[in-house]
Amino acid sequence: ELVALDHFNLTIEEGEIFGLLGPNGSGKTTTINCILALLAFDKGTVRVFGQEMRPDSYDLKRQIGVVMQNVAVFQELTVYENIDYFCGLYIRDKALRRQYVEDAIDFVGLNDFRKFYPKKLSGGLLRRLNIACGIAHKPKLIILDEPTVAVDPQSRNKILEGIQELNRNGATIIYTSHYME
């Protein structure tokens, strides 16, 4: 039986950028899934903002933005529609949501691509769309699982600069990578 995490303790302070660095298969994504209460574990607790995270911690989960390694967008929706859809899961007010979507498009630099469908985007632009979908609702905690995998160095640098800006704007960041950057 494979044990991915054993006697694992982790404290991340609000406002911090925390990196989980390790090779593929080392438990980074498993750790994220435990933090998000998507994966059951035998012992212990996970606390986010001082509250215990459980599968039904919906109010707490609204404060979290997640960008997983595998791009998860709808191919039949445009860039704008994808971001609007994911933001709408958290923000019901249409005017506020519209503003948040515009802010996310601006932030990731997809203004010229808002009417494009994902299949027309390069790998780097697709990653930026994935990030926009995860941050559009302006979460306090942003979890990014290998957000720069399989992108060119220029796109990687742009994504890393964006992550630092999100942190400067008050978000706590958990970032996984197998790159030593």
Task: Set out the residue ranges of the language-model regions.
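Catalytic Walker B motif of ABC-type/P-loop ATPase nucleotide-binding domains
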Residues: 142-145
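Conserved catalytic motifs of ABC-family nucleotide-binding domains
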Residues: 138
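Conserved ABC ATPase signature
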Residues: 76, 117-124
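Conserved ABC ATPase "signature" region
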Residues: 84, 88, 95-113
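Helix N-cap at the start of a conserved alpha-helix in ABC-type nucleotide-binding domains
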Residues: 153-155, 178
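Conserved ABC transporter NBD signature motif
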Residues: 44-55, 60
